Amino acid sequence: MTARTADGKPWTGRMRTAALRRGLVRPAEFSTWAGARRYHERHGRDRQVLEKLQASIPKDGIREPLLLGVRATDRLVFVFEGHHRAVIALELGVRSFPFRWFWDPDVQTVEHDPFPHHALGRDGQTWLRHQEARS
């Protein structure tokens, strides 16, 4: 599922991949990133996607931004789209990844406002690389 943007131009930022490892950004469908990796390894189509990303990310980077959800009730941040890319980014030691975001449960609209870095904790701004105004 791809959410649409409020004004046609989603806000895009970059986040340090270490935020995934530290549990500040969680996988939506799995309890851990290791669990996501194991699941994808066991399924042929998912395994093929991982293999393609292992080959393409070192030379091309992550071209498609991950879509992060921020739960409005408790500010939990999770990957909604991009689990395969996140798993490989962690595995390859990629320093940062592009992302877009939405307020959960409004998955239909990707935000055009800057990411609410406070959702990552008091030092949330330190997890963001640079913020791109609408791309």
Residue positions per predicted region:
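F-box-proximal linker/hinge
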Residues: 124-127
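Short, charged/polar connector segments at secondary-structure boundaries
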Residues: 1-80, 84-103, 107-119, 131-134
